[in-house]
Amino acid sequence: MDCNMVSSFPWDWENLIMSNQSKTENEKKQQSTEWEFEKGEGIESIVPDFLGFEKVSSGSATSFWHTAVSKSSQSTSINSSSPEDKRCNLASQSSPGDSSSNIDFLQVKPSTALEVPIASAESDLCLKLGKRTYSEEFWGRNNNDLSAVSMNLLTPSVVARKKTKSCGQSMQVPRCQIDGCELDLSSSKDYHRKHRVCETHSKCPKVVVSGLERRFCQQCSRFHAVSEFDEKKRSCRKRLSHHNARRRKPQGVFPLNSERVFDRRQHTSMLWNGLSLNTRSEEKYTWGTTYETKPTQMESGFTLSFQRGNGSEDQLFTGSTLSFSAFQTSGGFSAGKSNIQLPDKGVGECSGGLHESHDFYSALSLLSTTSDSQGIKHTPVAEPPPIFGTFPSHFI
């Protein structure tokens, strides 16, 4: 008996401990649900807070609480289910025939534990669709919080993209493209890294690129065939020709200045078949001051007229001008008009045939003899040679 009693005590203590633990667990589960209700119809009551959800119901609260207490085992299953399952389980607690136990859920407020992942998923969805939603009323957040969440979502992708780009650039090491060289150009000049040629091969007269003999042109910065280069030239022939053409100065065409070639005092212009002929010759005359003559008709057909000049007797001057305007005919020179221009002294005109040049000079001598009776002295010192119908070839 004693042994049985002694042996039964440990078994009873174990059963007692197990039963006490199950009772304490049930009490904790019942205490976790806070019930707040008021009796009467039409009064709003609050459903117990399961995992942060507050449910507002209306109707007969007394019948609803009795059904909820009688099925407390079902309330424990609600804690481990989703919000939609909770809504279905709470609706199934009331009997289908009882109209007073109808529950209307007006407002659902999720707890803060579920708020963060849902908000991040929603903002990610909005960024993918290219839209902007305003969920301040539902989530209780402002625009600054939403923008902060979107920036946090964007920054990892941008950083990852930059990292991949930098990794890709670091993987491409510049090397010389000459066959058999493949020199690392990371420490070379920018020019050689850009064109992928080392400094030694850029000056070589002949290199092999992709199995072909080439030479690097320093002005084109490209590889050309060896035949396009001259000896001891680092640039191709085509580029050198353009370069030399730019450096050469164009030779300007200087116009012919007649004043520098010909003397003003011996300038001659002629009219041959319609070109005028002007000749200048130096003559020396002595004119008086006390005379006034009228045009005199000569026997040879010349008409001479002189204007009064201003000067002293026996004055010697030069620069007289003898000009003729003539036209060529089949029988020689036709009758034309001759002007004798004397600077600062007057103008003498004569009209007649140029073929009578001898008579013209004889008329001048007659004029000098007739003027002696009137007190005028006209003594030609030098006479120009007679003009004939032949002219030098350089006047034509």
From Swiss-Prot:
The keyword Disulfide bond does not apply. Residues 74-104 are annotated as: Disordered. InterPro entries: SBP-like, SBP_dom, SBP_sf. GO terms for molecular function: DNA-binding transcription factor activity; sequence-specific DNA binding; zinc ion binding. Keywords: DNA-binding, Metal-binding, Nucleus, Transcription, Transcription regulation, Zinc, Zinc-finger. Zn(2+) 2 binds at residues 217, 220, 224, 236. It is found in: Nucleus. A zinc finger (SBP-type) spans 173-250. Zn(2+) 1 binds at residues 176, 181, 198, 201. Binds 2 Zn(2+) ions per subunit. Coiled coil: none annotated. One of its GO terms (biological process) is leaf shaping. Pfam families: SBP. Transmembrane segments: none annotated. GO terms for cellular component: nucleus. PANTHER family: SQUAMOSA PROMOTER-BINDING-LIKE PROTEIN 10, SQUAMOSA PROMOTER-BINDING-LIKE PROTEIN 4. The SBP-type zinc finger is required for the binding to DNA. This is Squamosa promoter-binding-like protein 10. It comes from Arabidopsis thaliana (Mouse-ear cress).
